[in-house]
Swiss-Prot record:
It comes from Nitratidesulfovibrio vulgaris (strain ATCC 29579 / DSM 644 / CCUG 34227 / NCIMB 8303 / VKM B-1760 / Hildenborough). Catalyzes the condensation of pantoate with beta-alanine in an ATP-dependent reaction via a pantoyl-adenylate intermediate. GO terms for cellular component: cytosol. InterPro entries: Pantoate_ligase, Pantoate_ligase_C, Rossmann-like_a/b/a_fold. The gene is panC. This is Pantothenate synthetase.
């Protein structure tokens, strides 16, 4: 596996591959890998001739007071895990090489970015869209693979590449969970032992919502009330950032469930802000 840090170097390599008709896949990451990341790399490896993994803790998607400085970093560990998954290139640029001092251009998808996570992180998706656009322009992959734990991120990026006519297929892959149901996340490292015991109840609450839906309930507020009641009893240390039931494509909230419907949440447990989601109706 090759480790590349210079943007122009990765772009030159990818231009050669594209000229030769090589099918490439990009897996954008912020590092500190776990089995969820490994599943994304494994999928990319299975469907592509060359796999590029980007490792970049993107300062532009963190707001004031967020965990940019604390976000876990271990390049040596991550490189070993990526190599074990058959990754061809690990692209690990420096922030100053992606964002020049006079950087003035941003990419936004306001229609999908101002709800859910965007309510408490108003500049987050501007940073995400800008860095993903940069990575796509540098690597020119046929596909880019993202985890569905951040469902909103996948929806935003899909709309972005559609609207900007970027020739890449955005692939969303299922959430990978711990045996007790907790969605795998690099931020799980922030949890204390007691918080780690409580955190799986985020998932269990969503599963209760799905069970209620499957029993015939179609009123969104009734379902959310049941989830919140469950959390109040089983997740006393949790602080809800948002809990919403939406159309999985448009992310528009729904009052009554009639077709494919997603329940998504962000919950703060101690120092960790944890995302999870679950389809209530549809695949």
């Amino acid at each position: 596996m090759q480790i590349i840090t210079e943007p122009q170097t990765i772009q030159q390599a990818c231009l050669r591959w594209r000229a030769d008709g090589v099918h490439t896949a990009l897996v954008p990451t912020m590092g500190y890998y776990h089995a969820g990341h490994e599943s994304l790399m494994a999928h990319a490896r299975a469907v592509s001739e060359k796999v590029i993994v980007s490792l970049f803790v993107n300062p532009a998607q963190f707001g004031p007071g967020e965990d940019f400085a604390a976000y876990p970093r271990d390049l040596e560990r991550d490189a070993a895990m990526a190599e074990a998954q058959g990754v061809d290139v690990l692209f690990a640029p420096k922030a100053e090489d992606l964002y020049k001092k006079d950087h003035a251009t941003w990419v936004e998808v306001p229609a999908l970015s101002q709800t859910m996570c965007g309510l408490s992180r108003p500049t987050h998706f501007r940073g995400v869209c800008t860095v993903v656009t940069k990575l796509l322009m540098l690597t020119m992959p046929r596909i880019a693979v993202f985890g569905q734990k951040d469902w909103q991120q996948v929806a935003v990026i899909r709309r972005m590449v559609r609207d900007l006519n970027i020739p890449v297929d955005i692939v969303g892959r299922p959430i990978v969970r711990e045996p007790d149901g907790l969605a795998m996340s690099s931020r799980n490292i922030y949890l204390t032992a007691e918080e780690r015991l409580q955190a799986p109840h985020i998932h269990h609450g969503l599963a209760l919502g799905r069970a209620i839906t499957q029993s015939g309930e179609r009123d969104a507020e009734t379902i959310k009330t049941a989830i919140r009641r469950y959390w109040a009893q089983n997740l006393p240390g949790g602080e809800e950032d948002y809990l919403t039931i939406v159309d999985p494509v448009s992310l528009e909230p729904v009052d009554r469930l009639t077709g494919a419907t997603l329940c998504a949440t962000a919950v703060r447990v101690g120092q960790a802000r944890l995302l999870d989601n679950m389809m209530l109706l549809g695949d």
